[in-house]
A protein has these predicted regions:
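TPR-repeat structural position
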Residues: 2-3, 40-41, 74, 114, ...
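Single-residue signature of alpha-solenoid repeat helices
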Residues: 5, 43-44, 77, 117
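Hydrophobic/aromatic packing residues within the alpha-helices of TPR/SEL1-like helical repeat arrays
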Residues: 9, 47-48, 81, 121
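Flexible helix-coil transition and linker loops at the boundaries of alpha-helical arrays
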Residues: 13-26, 87-94
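Amphipathic alpha-helical segments of tetratricopeptide repeats
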Residues: 13-14, 52-53, 82-88, 125-126
Length: 140
C-alpha cells in the first residue's frame, strides 16, 4: 500500500535526521519510489531539495533521474542517469549501469532520436525492456 507507506515516510522525514545514515538514505529513496508508484510525479521534485545531502549513492542519483524524466526535464534526467553510472556500487541492480542506459534510451526514443535510443539500448545487454525498445524503434 504505497499511500499508507508514503504517510509513514512523511512522518519519519519530519524528524531531524542524519543523511549519512544508511537507513535514512533508504527511507528517502523508498519514499521517492512510493511517490512514483502513486503517480505523484510532481511531488518527487522534493528530491532536489536534499540533493547535496543524499547524492552519495547511485541509487539516489538514479531516482533523481527518474524524477526529472517523469517531470519532462529530459536533459537533467540524462545528466543524472549518466552520473549514476559513475558510481561503482548500488543497492538496486542496474541503476549504475544498464537501467540508467535503458532510461536514457527511452528518453531519446520519446524525443524521436532513434539512433541515440538504439545506442543506449545496445549498452543494456540482454535486458528485456531494452531489447523490446530496439524492436519498437524498428531495429532487430
Amino acid at each position: 500500500d504505497y499511500e499508507k507507506a508514503s504517510e509513514y515516510f512523511e512522518k519519519g522525514l519530519e524528524y531531524d535526521l542524519n543523511p549519512k545514515l544508511e537507513y535514512v538514505q533508504d527511507m528517502v529513496e523508498t519514499y521517492g519510489y512510493s511517490l512514483l508508484n502513486q503517480k505523484r510525479i510532481q511531488e518527487m521534485m522534493f528530491l532536489e531539495n536534499v540533493y547535496n545531502e543524499f547524492a552519495v549513492s547511485a541509487d539516489y542519483v538514479f531516482l533523481m533521474g527518474l524524477a526529472y524524466m517523469n517531470n519532462g526535464l529530459f536533459d537533467k534526467a540524462i545528466d543524472e542517469f549518466n552520473k549514476a553510472k559513475l558510481y561503482k556500487l548500488c543497492k538496486i541492480e542496474g541503476c549504475n549501469s544498464y537501467k540508467a542506459d535503458y532510461n536514457i534510451g527511452v528518453i531519446y526514443e520519446c524525443l524521436g532520436n532513434k539512433e541515440k535510443a538504439l545506442e543506449n539500448y545496445k549498452k543494456c545487454g540482454r535486458y528485456d525492456p531494452a531489447l523490446n525498445g530496439i524492436k519498437r524503434i524498428g531495429y532487430n
